Amino acid sequence: MRPEIEQELAHTLLVELLAYQFASPVRWIETQDVILAEKRTERIVEIGPADTLGGMARRTLASKYEAYDAATSVQRQILCYNKDAKEIYYDVDPVEEETESAPEAAAAPPTSAAPAAAVVAAPAPAASAPSAGPAAPVEDAPVTALDIVRTLVAQKLKKALSDVPLNKAIKDLVGGKSTLQNEILGDLGKEFGSTPEKPEDTPLDELGASMQATFNGQLGKQSSSLIARLVSSKMPGGFNITAVRKYLETRWGLGPGRQDGVLLLALTMEPASRIGSEPDAKVFLDDVANKYAANSGISLNVPTASGDGGASAGGMLMDPAAIDALTKDQRALFKQQLEIIARYLKMDLRDGQKAFVASQETQKTLQAQLDLWQAEHGDFYASGIEPSFDPLKARVYDSSWNWARQDALSMYYDIIFGRLKVVDREIVSQCIRIMNRSNPLLLEFMQYHIDNCPTERGETYQLAKELGEQLIENCKEVLGVSPVYKDVAVPTGPQTTIDARGNIEYQEVPRASARKLEHYVKQMAEGGPISEYSNRAKVQNDLRSVYKLIRRQHRLSKSSQLQFNALYKDVVRALSMNENQIMPQENGSTKKPGRNGSVRNGSPRAGKVETIPFLHLKKKNEHGWDYSKKLTGIYLDVLESAARSGLTFQGKNVLMTGAGAGSIGAEVLQGLISGGAKVIVTTSRYSREVTEYYQAMYARYGARGSQLVVVPFNQGSKQDVEALVDYIYDTKKGLGWDLDFIVPFAAIPENGREIDSIDSKSELAHRIMLTNLLRLLGSVKAQKQANGFETRPAQVILPLSPNHGTFGNDGLYSESKLALETLFNRWYSENWSNYLTICGAVIGWTRGTGLMSGNNMVAEGVEKLGVRTFSQQEMAFNLLGLMAPAIVNLCQLDPVWADLNGGLQFIPDLKDLMTRLRTEIMETSDVRRAVIKETAIENKVVNGEDSEVLYKKVIAEPRANIKFQFPNLPTWDEDIKPLNENLKGMVNLDKVVVVTGFSEVGPWGNSRTRWEMEASGKFSLEGCVEMAWIMGLIRHHNGPIKGKTYSGWVDSKTGEPVDDKDVKAKYEKYILEHSGIRLIEPELFKGYDPKKKQLLQEIVIEEDLEPFEASKETAEEFKREHGEKVEIFEVLESGEYTVRLKKGATLLIPKALQFDRLVAGQVPTGWDARRYGIPEDIIEQVDPVTLFVLVCTAEAMLSAGVTDPYEFYKYVHLSEVGNCIGSGIGGTHALRGMYKDRYLDKPLQKDILQESFINTMSAWVNMLLLSSTGPIKTPVGACATAVESVDIGYETIVEGKARVCFVGGFDDFQEEGSYEFANMKATSNAEDEFAHGRTPQEMSRPTTTTRAGFMESQGCGMQLIMSAQLALDMGVPIYGIIALTTTATDKIGRSVPAPGQGVLTTARENPGKFPSPLLDIKYRRRQLELRKRQIREWQESELLYLQEEAEAIKAQNPADFVVEEYLQERAQHINREAIRQEKDAQFSLGNNFWKQDSRIAPLRGALATWGLTVDEIGVASFHGTSTVANDKNESDVICQQMKHLGRKKGNALLGIFQKYLTGHPKGAAGAWMFNGCLQVLDSGLVPGNRNADNVDKVMEKFDYIVYPSRSIQTDGIKAFSVTSFGFGQKGAQVIGIHPKYLYATLDRAQFEAYRAKVETRQKKAYRYFHNGLVNNSIFVAKNKAPYEDELQSKVFLNPDYRVAADKKTSELKYPPKPPVATDAGSESTKAVIESLAKAHATENSKIGVDVESIDSINISNETFIERILPASEQQYCQNAPSPQSSFAGRWSAKEAVFKSLGVCSKGAGAPLKDIEIENDSNGAPTLHGVAAEAAKEAGVKHISVSISHSDMQAVAVAISQF
């Protein structure tokens, strides 16, 4: 059979087999069963590229056949040919024979298994245990030139040897990186001495062959150097190059040449870090040697044993006893020598043992004491008495002046947005809180907002104005009055309901009988039936009856006995309730009106019963404490007054414990600070959450003059008790207060402890609630006594309890409370009554507290018995009443007992009653649940299983909808039209700079996710999804998972599907922990750990060191450096050198410093540029900060809707796209490598220098994305870089050097910068912050009292800016207008970082007596219209003279001159010149009118350009670094600017301090701030500084700034200011304006056309963004320029060259021939020229030329249109494609006709209907009226008209023939 037929048949067979394979089911499970069960196969070998089927077979064996094989003794082998070659071929290692000379070794135990384990761990399949002898030698062969070439290339490319194909040249392999190519060529030159011509273009195999001829087979300088570096930097200490070669020789039998080959291969397999031990190094070498053998096609031999035999375990074995016998004498000698030396040195060798024995005895004694203490007190007690008080952690809140303005503004907008619609209790409560903080600053602030409230916008604005005016009046009235606690909330009662399904619901509902606290006081005074008691007369009558019944007791009937029992009970009850009520000497006659409930009720039941109020005071007598009408009357008067007029605590100092969230104490605390008190409150659970709770409380309730101090405190600790009181009274290191009130409410529950289970917790509780409470009072007494404060006793509100063991199961709780009552007697018996007064409050049932919340459900049932339970609000009101001056005065006379029990003490068996009520509720619930369950079962039986589906509640969980939104476009009628009248056509749009895109990479991901966190303080579901993607927690998957098709998110680690709605729940905690400001994560900074910051210490060695081995080159370098202090000698066997450092040589020894800057703002953990699509080779080449810049550039373009950067070149020339991105420092990683790593001689890329330049990052942007030839400017402005960049970009566009610019800044975080900032004391000290109780997230606190330095951060921020005209033409979104950019330096000084005030010059002006008329936009409009008319007249005159010019030139050059071409070009020039002049006029009178005018400040002028004033700047984003000096200086600068420019009083800016969230990224700072302000413009939401817990008092004087701590939704921001300050006297400011002011310069048609473009672009960007997320392709690097190489110079030199879509590939690229430049108005110009030529060719004719601006015709003015156009022409114009242009053309034509008749125009108001323009080919007008008469008088026979349009104007030529 012929070969060709064989080949054809083989091909056919292969195709058929493959078809069969693909078409048939695999049935592998069945196949396995046949092989394993039916055939019982024991040895299976897989032949294939990987161990696939074998792995499946192993799993099948383990799951199905393991027990079967064990039972049948079947042993199976699963082998794969590419891993188990030796086992398949039965190629076993030779067994070493036993040595005859040591017969006993056979019986000895085998040697340690450790070496064997090491061998098993090695990846080499042929590895075996170390042997007694060397391996058999392998035939040696030197390395080839190709081996070295390929290795050097692979090592430089950081690729495996197999990934470097030999058929490719170096130029192809480096991928266009010329620097890398030059490095490789340099290495080859160093290695071989010389290289062939153009080695970069020669394939590697040819290059190696050409070098082989002159190659000597030895390693050259470069390869030897790399190998030496590998061994010294990655091998363990002592394992030098000689040891490496010796191991390769003895282990594998490799000669010098083969060793070279192995070491060359090792260069391409270099470990990431130094290998830890010698066995691990040998494992690495084994792996390399085996791969070398596989590559070289040789077989490595196993080492053989030396001698005649060897031990099976690899070495001769000896009996340990024999070894011990051999060494016994030696050890004895050593011991003897040691003892002699010790005696000589007078040392006791047993000192340590003796000390240990003594310490053991001491330890036993101490341990016994500890055990005893532990046994007696228990673990809970031990941990519960640990002190926690720390004055450093004290938080002081006193900035009520700032929170007042914040609350007033929030309330204003709440009313405007309809959240507060009616004047309800909540509004009244807010008003009272604002009144309590009333101050002149607040009044000015409110007055401005109310005076400028735009009531025409709707009812809510009118309501806001009405309420605001009323509130202002109220605030004025209380301006000099003390703040008061006044609660206007509705009193509530308990309500427990059980629905039909048996669900128990408890809620607080308003009490119908008490709508306010005044009613509540009345009810408390009235008491109830349960608190009734018999008066004196009734008791006497009852006693007489009882006496009579006793006398005839033996004759009593059954009914009489019952009567006797009832009477007796009444008498006993009356006596027990209040014995002194029947004694006239105490309270007088019962008929005398008393201050009790019966009097208040109006009808005392004299002679029958009276009531005790639910709230009453008791007085002590000889029998105990009894209800006192007199004292109770005083107390109820106080409560009534407090409910009506409020209660002030101004000037009072209070200590509170036990005021945690949800407690009575917290409500009391609110009342105290509302009343102006200074309170120190303690917390046993000190944390950020707790301090934020108290801060929020103070911000809401804190009144003028109040102060809240929060400290950590454990009342179980005696040390804390003393330290706390010392802190309060210490005038230097503490508060320096003298206490007026002590409210010690701290307690811990002891539920479930009866008398037989009193434990450690009970003892601790007793200590807290009794022992240390008394200690606390004692400490206060001692301090008052020591300071001589005898006339200012502190009132103690003792928390008593009615529970005197009544409830039980509460440990020592009742004993603790009962014991407090001894203080009532001690007050008399001890000597502290001058310092402390006692008011004991028996606190009743208070619902919702931690102790009583479990009983809420039965509270309603208990109240039905006639008693009263209390809400926390009510009980706090009761307690605050006890702190009123009247009660305080009573306490100074005698201790006061306040019974606030609500009559609860009158209920017998309360516990049983509660149990019964709870049982009834639960039984009812259970019955209803059972009924519902039964009904459901019945329903299923009757109607089917699925019948309930329609009735079940289904909660629809929202899915993530990741939007990619452009800014909201304003509506024309509501937002733009009101501005259009003044702004239309008033600016030169080519000179207006707008922001069309922005982006950032920072600690919170990107600008979208950062805004979510900044605006709302949390991530949405969409934000979590995007952050999870950014951090690599999830990725998108589209394909099969577990046999099912799946498209969606999967977990990156497990590959398991993750539903987007579950992303927030699953990943949010991790995201928050690893984003933002946090502890430095070493893995993000190449292992940098600030706790172990490495420094080098130089030392001089004092004795010769042991020699070590190095290469000849390295050894000579040591000799060169150290001279005689080093010895070097050659090792003859290896050619290496030994080096010995001698005495006097210097060494640099690393040491670790514990650095205190532990926290920084870091990009989210897991951020990876690969995820965005940046190629691997770029990531390895560039500095990490370059990656930030590249990602930002891609995202900035995407936010502008530009998905292909080459799209710019459809609209502008290559030279008009600029790059102004800058940095403060640049590539810090590159700088670190260049200076530190290079100094330490670490491996480093050769072109590291280029990556350190600050402009390199911009270069990479251009090389990978833009390919532009536009201006590149690289600002370096330290922390102000980004704003300086905006300034440069703005000027570049305004000056016409570019039309598009990328601006922004970037900087990285690096340990060197962190250390030097710390040395300057500029940054926050994390250790100090931790000591002050701050979390990392709190450490950046701009404007606060405790700010302590800025927090470093890293990232990049960017904006894409362009001229407004280009933005409109492209249809890109416009985020904001850049109205002004300025930079400034400062004065003479010596401090580089000192903050300056040079930016004040932005407001520089020296105004005249009257404001400049240029500030009036109407005045400027008049001037502009006048200038436009002049330009049109000039244009008309130039067109009229064209023919004469042409005739004159033709007369001089009759042959070559073409009149038509000349006229065409000149007319186009006139048209262009007219447009230029008009734009110049717009620029001069619109954009630029204020420049060089000392009467107008740049800031004022920039705003006036858009019709705005300084009062309309809504927000200011501050540099706000959280340093003491900057925050104060910056606020001062802004305030001075506003004041100087006449901003109205009270019109305070809202301050944004973004760095509390992001930290300070230096170069990127201004860009992030600017981005945030653009988001504020779009949303109207002003984010607050959430870390502003207490604004510094020094900021109060800056009255033009509000410092919000929470986000405030406004009704719109018109303009903003961004200020930025940088080290080195850099100050910068940017003013941004809402884009609606730009749209107001357009007409409606232009705006609608733009809107359509933007919407189309947004859809395209949305698709691109989502594809980028799914495919990791947001960044797409360009591989080539948009033009072919041969077109480069043509494209560069032709400013009109533009790209076009390639018909085949759809790529944007420059066509071979530039498009013919066409003037937009060429056709219209041609028509004008033809008309003029016709006119000059016609005798007896007169020409009229008129030019009109298209936008000068107001077509919306119907009256005007009626006067100039008849109905037929109006209809024609309205139907035209551009009605505006058509109307302008008709107007121009009529004016031209007038001019051709020789009649002067009568102006815009003249009726032009007399001239009717026909639409025929001649365009002959029909004249009527005055026009017809004028034509008749002039003898006009015929008139023709030609009309033409351009984008901006209409030109008409009329010719009248006579």
Curated annotation (Swiss-Prot):
Q: Which residues form the active site?
A: 1279 (for beta-ketoacyl synthase activity), 1519 (for beta-ketoacyl synthase activity), 1560 (for beta-ketoacyl synthase activity)
Q: Which residues of the sequence carry a binding annotation for Mg(2+)?
A: 1746-1748, 1844-1845
| Residue numbers of O-(pantetheine 4'-phosphoryl)serine PTMs | 178
Q: Where is this region: Disordered?
A: 580-606
User: Could you tell me which residue ranges the Ketosynthase family 3 (KS3) domain spans?
Assistant: 1097-1634
Any Pfam family from its record, for instance, is: ketoacyl-synt
Q: Where is the composition biased (Polar residues)?
A: 580-590
A GO cellular component term found in this entry reads: fatty acid synthase complex
**UniProt KW keywords:** Fatty acid biosynthesis, Fatty acid metabolism, Lipid biosynthesis, Lipid metabolism, Magnesium, Metal-binding, Multifunctional enzyme, NAD, NADP, Oxidoreductase, Phosphopantetheine, Phosphoprotein, Transferase
Q: Which GO terms describe its molecular function?
A: 3-oxoacyl-[acyl-carrier-protein] reductase (NADPH) activity; 3-oxoacyl-[acyl-carrier-protein] synthase activity; fatty acid synthase activity; fatty-acyl-CoA synthase activity; holo-[acyl-carrier-protein] synthase activity; magnesium ion binding
A biological process from GO? long-chain fatty acid biosynthetic process
What functional role does this protein have?
Fatty acid synthetase catalyzes the formation of long-chain fatty acids from acetyl-CoA, malonyl-CoA and NADPH. The alpha subunit contains domains for: acyl carrier protein, 3-oxoacyl-[acyl-carrier-protein] reductase, and 3-oxoacyl-[acyl-carrier-protein] synthase.
Protein name as catalogued: Fatty acid synthase subunit alpha
Taxonomic path: Eukaryota, Fungi, Dikarya, Ascomycota, Pezizomycotina
The gene designation is fasA
